[in-house]
Amino acid sequence: MIDQPPLDGDGYWFEDIDGDGAQELLSVDNRFLYAFDSYAGSLAPLRIAKLRNGSIEDVTDESAMRKRLIQDLAGAEYEAKVRPDLWHENGFLAGWVANKIRLGEGDAAWAKVAGNMKEDTGFGPQVCTSGQKIEDCPADNLKPIPVLKGLASFLKENGYGPLPAAAEALTH
């Protein structure tokens, strides 16, 4: 038995992405759920793993997975074509820009996100003014931080990089 953190929804689904005869394990990056919007309003980027030497290893960024990542991004962009309001929803934009950065298309994507993200949506990154961990912080000590700064830090902390220069500048 292999221990893994719990996954939301239906867990893994399986595809042989690289054509080697072994099924890859696909899931979404649960860290995006509720981070910038409601669960339903969140676009969680695809994660791809393989069973190697008795453990599950993240292979999302391996070159053999690139076509599948492009396919996933195309699906999200098609959804936004059908529902143009998504281009003004923080949860969608956060996942979309993460996908674009992962594919090396972050500069133009960051500019689009910077022009479309909204402050004060009730979701998004916060700091605790009393210095406690967020989960232990009294509600009156929670203060929102600017959404773009929070998004840039979130992406960097969770391995979505390298960030575009404009986003990287916000993490200092």
Regions found by a protein language model. Give the residues of each.
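Hydrophobic/aromatic beta-strand elements that line small-molecule binding cavities or substrate pockets
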Residues: 11-15, 46-49
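Feature marking well-ordered beta-strand scaffolds used for ligand recognition
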Residues: 1-3, 58
